[in-house]
Amino acid sequence: MDFLLGNPFSSPVGQRIERATDGSLRGEDWSLNMEICDIINETEEGPKDAFRAIKKRIVGNKNFHEVMLALTVLETCVKNCGHRFHILVASQDFVESVLVRTILPKNNPPAIVHDKVLTLIQSWADAFRSSPDLTGVVAVYEDLRRKGLEFPMTDLDMLSPIHTPRRSVYSSNSQSGQNSPAVNSPQQMESILHPVTLPSGRDTSSNVPITPTQEQIKKLRSELEVVNGNVKVMSEMLTELVPSQAETSDLELLQELNRTCRAMQQRVLELIPRVQHEQLTEELLLINDNLNNVFLRHERFERVRTGQPVKAPSEAENNLIDLRPSTPPAVRQPEVTNNLSSQLAGMTLGSRSVSAGLHSLDTSGKLEEEFDMFAVTRGSSLAEQRREVKYEDPQATKGLAGALDARQQNTGAEESSASSDGAQLTNWMMRQGMVPVPQANFMEDIEKWLSTDVGESEDGKGVTSEEFDKFLEERAKVADRLPTLSSSSAGTPVSPAAASRHQKQAKEDDAMFAL
């Protein structure tokens, strides 16, 4: 078939591949390799011509230096060319008949060529695993693993992404934008999110423990840093993005990050039980925890974005004590008052002692109103008050005697109806100054004086203010006419009857002036 198509090196790209893989070269010609990639991307027949030329240079060639240069050109083209070239080199036929055939024991290839071929197969299998039309290399890779073939550890220093941005031609009007990279382009996204192949040493399906060397530990830790970087980027995106306002490009990048991190977690889980290194095992476990946490956050993000219903609380949550205030079905809103009795009445304590205390507070409120009336009368003159008030008026309950008498009756009613709890509450309120303290002896003296004063009056009518003023003037005149006691008569003893009358008269005068 190749004979019918002619010489593979006769095409423009074939000629350059022939020069780039010449055995006389001491090393790779990278400028020529990149020129080959440009021709493949820009021409219609470039991928097929390059594929035929590379295949011709590798198959049956005993000059392994040329084979090594051809493998380098092949790797460069896969990393820098598009899907048209990937379909050709990722096919199962090319991988088995060209690459695997080259490293067969009968060909006796050097170790560097053997490792180079296995590295290419492994990296392509990891990169093309999610592409349905590029799974030929994946099938070959899995078959080689089942046969027990050991793949080399990945060298991160030499690792570069499979997919790189295509060559773009900028117009003269867009030269200013040439310096700023397009971070949201699909090619760069694929380049950033290419899953890094963690070292496996042996077939990961077996349980053979791995004791890594110092070089392997260094490479593994550098790869774990890449995993941590992806986890950090995904976590920051979940923090910044709003589920209902996220753009399509951001959601695509987030989904790609999620797939990449899940692929990395599978490799981490394979290494955890096999690595015989305590510190590395701790680092792997920590990375696995971070991956699980970011996956949970992503699931919650998707649940909110898609509007899925939130899970109902479990029965265990319903069994918890509800400390919120319970509201009855029909509650009458109390009126807002500043009265202390109204505030205490709103507290449903259900105790007779509290009822007795509220009754006493209501009584004290009435007394406050009565004393407020006395405060209002202080604005008028004393003569006007005496002309308007009769001291013996039975209806004059605004006086001090009536108020004190009402207070005594209320206090007596409280003491007779209150229980032992009510007495304790009343005593406490008295000590706090909330309820006036009853003065029984003082009340008895006032009542005794009032009854005596009423008995001595000849008529049932009270004394007016004018009569009281006249009485005071007469008393003053009598006092002026009294003789002055001499020093000789000062020591004369006074009879007991006169002393009793004088004392009684003094008490009456004091009581009158007190009113």
Swiss-Prot record:
Residues 166-185, 307-333, 480-515 are annotated as: Disordered. Residues 169-185 have a biased composition (Polar residues). This is Target of Myb1 membrane trafficking protein. InterPro entries: ENTH_VHS, GAT_dom, GAT_sf, TOM1, VHS_dom. Found in a complex with TOLLIP; interacts (via GAT domain) with TOLLIP (via N-terminus); the interactions leads to TOM1-recruitment to endosomes and inhibition of TOLLIP binding to PtdIns(3)P. Interacts (via GAT domain and the C-terminal part of the VHS domain) with UBC/ubiquitin. Interacts (via clathrin box and C-terminus) with clathrin heavy chain. Interacts with MYO6. Residues 20-152 form the VHS domain. Gene3D superfamilies: 1.20.58.160, 1.25.40.90.
